[in-house]
Design a protein with these regions (language model features):
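Internal active-site segments that recognize and position negatively charged phosphoryl groups
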Residues: 111-124, 134-188
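Short coil/turn connectors at secondary-structure junctions
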Residues: 1-3, 24-27, 45, 66-69, ...
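Conserved small/polar residues in nucleotide/adenosyl-binding loops
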Residues: 195-196
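N-terminal glycine-rich phosphate/adenylate-binding segment common to multiple enzyme folds
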Residues: 56-127
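N-terminal beta-loop-helix "entrance" segment that forms/cooperates
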Residues: 33-53
């Protein structure tokens, strides 16, 4: 049976991937992050190993020991864990010391490069999850109003700017005013802040 590795963060995304991969008949080897990954992931995978944020050497060893050559990352890790609660192993310490910028995109690309250097291919996170991807176009029963279209365009421009700055991935707007911007606290907190 083909194996796939799962680097699991928080939320339901890792569970959705594990279920989809099992339905495809794959053996799922998961590395889960303490304090982030939902414990019920263990029910959906063939093997689960728990690590603390920064234990990159342990993470790689798990996949190598199981003969895993393809992995993907699913779910987030609260960025605050890098500064509070991380317990990096030697490889993780060396990795973090090399990182000039600890921005989300920089970290993810560097982790992927580290895995690739060990012969582990990082696959797209939506592998086997096409059914969860939104189709292009209008997804509701009605078209956006003129005002909503202005908000969409305004929000798109603002989102591209915060993306360039690597601040976050979520932005909430209304009446062409920014109500919330995702920062270190994450998407869910940005959503909570925006409720009016």
């Amino acid at each position: 049976m083909e194996k796939i590795g799962l680097i699991a963060g928080n939320g339901s995304f890792p569970l959705a991937f594990a279920r989809a991969a099992k339905q495809k008949g794959l053996t799922v080897i998961a590395v889960a992050h303490e304090g982030e990954t939902l414990p019920e992931l263990a029910q959906w995978v063939d093997s689960i190993s728990w690590v603390k944020v920064g234990q990159l050497g342990k993470l790689i060893k798990v996949f190598k020991d199981h003969g895993v050559h393809d992995v993907l990352m699913a779910g987030g890790i609260k960025k605050t864990r890098l500064f509070d609660g991380a317990l990096p192993d030697l490889r993780g310490m060396a990795f973090l010391a090399r990182m000039i910028h600890k921005k989300d995109d920089s970290l993810l690309r560097a982790v992927a490069a580290e895995l690739e250097s060990e012969g582990i291919t990082v696959r797209e996170s939506t592998l086997y999850l096409d059914n969860l991807l939104a189709a292009s176009g209008i997804l509701t029963k009605r078209k956006p109003s003129k005002e909503e279209k202005l908000d969409i365009e305004f929000g798109w421009q603002m989102a591209k700017e915060i993306g360039k700055l690597d601040i976050g991935q979520t932005l909430v707007v209304k009446d062409q005013a920014v109500l919330a911007v995702e920062a270190i606290e994450g998407t869910d907190e940005a959503d909570r802040k925006s409720v009016v």
